[in-house]
Design a protein with these regions (language model features):
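N-terminal binding-site loop/beta-alpha segment at the start of enzyme catalytic domains
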Residues: 1-74, 108, 141
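Conserved, mostly hydrophobic/aromatic
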Residues: 6, 18, 46, 59, ...
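Active-site mouth loops of central-metabolism enzymes
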Residues: 19-29, 79-95, 233-242
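Acidic-and-aromatic substrate-binding clefts and catalytic sites of carbohydrate-active enzymes
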Residues: 23-29, 47-57, 80-81, 89, ...
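Short, acidic/polar
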Residues: 26-38, 89-106, 152-160, 243-251
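Active-site groove signature of glycoside hydrolases
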Residues: 100-123
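Beta/alpha (TIM)-barrel catalytic core signal, keyed to glycine-rich beta->alpha loops juxtaposed to Asp/Glu
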Residues: 118-320, 330-344, 370
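Short cysteine clusters
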Residues: 303-312, 352-358, 362
Length: 381
């Protein structure tokens, strides 16, 4: 299992994570064994947004023997009221719910204290001067949470968090279908029966979010990586074709700042399906050819950083160069952080010999040689 640095937290998290929301469906012992099995496969980061006692108890039992080997995303503001999940900022519920999380997880600290589920810009702005945020800061100051994170499905809100200076990582919904969707405060638009057929390529607000995370060294962990399983079924997929878990995971891992994918598991076989990413061939990871040939929703002409353009006669890392170009051109001037990352590349865009061999391999018809010229001009090398 490979690990990635989770932005400014400096935590080395496994590329495949554990999304715990399905644990309550199964007998307690079975779910505890599933956590143990995931750990044996090298998974070391787990998301617990669930407020129900059963899920929290299962996780507590599942991690108690090796708590120090796990990084826990624990959500602040996810509460259990009248036998139901209730998202709130009311401190009479927030504080006891978080204390309950610590108790049931049998721990005195949470690695990643998550500002839970903010999808409205107005709510994000209101939270900045609130008793709720004072509590989050108190938890950080006293070491009860080691780092501050935030979860959102709205790229505009997530971008504000990334630029806040105190949010160190973000749990965000990423997959090739959601990346086409415009920003919305309504999560239901992500799971509509039909996608707008006019949507093409990566939505600009999502691209801006990825750029902001890259610039501010804010790591991303991914939820909804499989779009609730829709992407596995060609009849339900907005592309009209099916993708595999490995292809979905690889798509997410080719987005800037992404460090880990929080997958939900019912069985050990599903853990194996996700962990298979670590030993998958380039052909097995190849989401690009599938999407490029899909009957719906085109990414034509847009680089998705899939790497199909390799190998390059001049040894350019074309996908990475394109990524830096896209991030840089979203601002009037090239950000210093993006420039410094680009300058660390061993081979620069100016070394492109214009053979266009890469273009014959690109499934999306990206004019790569032309983009190398533009990149060399933009960065001056």
């Amino acid at each position: 299992m490979k690990t990635r640095r989770l932005g400014k937290t400096e935590l080395q998290v496994s590329e495949i994570g554990f999304g715990g929301e399905w644990l309550e469906r199964h007998p307690e012992e079975e779910s505890i064994e599933l956590i143990h099995y995931a750990s044996s496969k090298g998974i070391n980061i787990l998301d617990c947004w669930m407020p129900d006692p059963k899920s929290r108890n299962i996780i507590g039992e599942g991690i108690k023997e090796n708590r120090d080997k796990w990084f826990i995303q624990g959500h602040i503001g996810s509460t259990w009221k009248d036998e139901q999940y209730y998202r709130t900022r009311e401190m009479e519920y927030v504080r006891p719910a978080f204390e309950d999380l610590l108790k049931r997880l049998q721990t005195d600290y949470i690695d990643l204290g998550m500002i839970h589920y903010v999808d409205s810009e107005e709510e994000w702005d209101d939270l900045q001067q609130s008793e709720y945020m004072d509590y989050v800061m108190e938890l950080k100051r006293t070491g009860v949470i080691r780092h501050i994170g935030m979860s959102s499905h709205n790229p505009k809100v997530a971008k504000k968090a990334a630029e806040s200076g105190y949010v160190e990582m973000i749990l965000f919904s990423i997959n090739p279908a959601f990346d086409m969707l415009p920003a919305s405060e309504n999560i239901d638009t992500m799971f509509a029966e039909e996608f707008d057929s006019s949507l093409k390529g990566i939505d600009a607000d999502r691209a801006r979010l990825y750029k902001a995370c890259e610039e501010n060294d804010v790591g991303i962990t991914v939820m909804k990586g499989f779009a609730g399983g829709r992407l596995f079924d060609e009849k339900r997929s907005p592309f009209g074709v099916s993708l595999t878990p490995v292809q979905c995971i690889h798509y997410a891992h080719t987005r800037p700042s992404v460090c880990s994918i929080m997958c939900g598991y019912d069985t050990k076989e599903q853990v194996n399906d996700a962990v298979a990413y670590e030993t998958a061939t380039e052909g097995e990871k190849d989401y690009a050819s599938v999407i490029a040939n899909a009957p719906f929703h085109s990414y034509k002409g847009e680089c998705t950083y899939c790497g199909h353009c390799k190998p390059c006669a001049a040894e350019l890392d074309i996908a990475m160069i394109n990524k830096f170009y896209d991030l840089a051109t979203m601002q009037p001037e090239v950000p210093a952080t993006i420039r410094s990352h680009y300058e660390l590349l061993e081979h620069k865009a100016s070394e492109c010999i214009g053979c266009q061999e890469c273009e014959t391999r690109c499934p999306f018809g990206v004019p790569i040689a032309e983009r190398m010229e533009k990149t060399a001009k933009l960065f001056g090398c």
